[in-house]
Amino acid sequence: MKKYYLILVAVFISLNVLSQSIFKRTLKLMGSHFEITVVANDSAQAQQFVNLAINEIKRIEKLISSWDKNSQTSHINANAGVLPVVVDSELLELINRSINISKLTDGAFDISYASMDKIWKFDGSMKIMPSGQLIKASVEKVGYQNIVINKNESTVFLKLPGMKIGFGAIGKGYAADKAKELLIANGVTAGIINASGDMNTWGKQPNGKEWKVAITNPMNKNNVFATLPVTDGAVVTSGNYEKYITFNGKRYTHIIDPRTGYPSSGIISATVFAPKAELADALATSVFVMGVEVGLNRINQLPKIECIIIDDEGNIFKSDNIKIN
């Protein structure tokens, strides 16, 4: 009798999985294009799931936005050099993890990059390279070491007047993680949160196949050189081949090294695979700044983290434990 019952349950589950379909919705959130994909029984159920994700992403945006004057992040920035600001534990922990990533990357990732003076222009209007003195001065207020966290009082304090923090290099990844967690908690068995290229997946397609991500060379975006399965993890690519400037024959990308104030050079694309999109997001930017050799060396020291790097000559580099098909 028990065997018969188990067989019936197994058949029911199998039929239910086969009856599910993939549903997608694309919209603009956090100033970027998001595509939310869920596996659901029908469009009505899918719409409920997608709305859950949208509301969660909007909640995160309100918490971390530096454009919203009423956000806790804006209050932190407004009180830089003045006094500590009480924040929600969620924001406190995000800032704390960001500081830890800064330490891990020797400052190549730094949420206080928002303090940087905007002296570089990548729209084609810049004809003369800024002076070394101006570049050095542009990062005087940048430095994660000047972010003070008090966990007992749940406060954040920026030591320097005029100092700011921003989550541009980690925020979308974090939002994707939180949306994914919420959907899983509400019974969504599989899906993808694509936050403008920051992809976070879980489960499998209704046909039992794994989700796959295509890796392209930005020098030839129509040419896919690798297709990799991603069942329960995140993939983030940093870099934009079109946004760069050239001085004295050297190409500089739009991603600025927060330690020096100089634009990064040598890499045009860095793709990072990690269990969470938050970490993949931050590390992709960090690898871009650190360069091929240092970036690969750092990634190879981290468990469950892999990366693919393309340099400005089109050469492809990969971390030790990733296989490219």
Predicted segments — roles?
Residues 2-10:
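Sec-dependent signal peptide recognition
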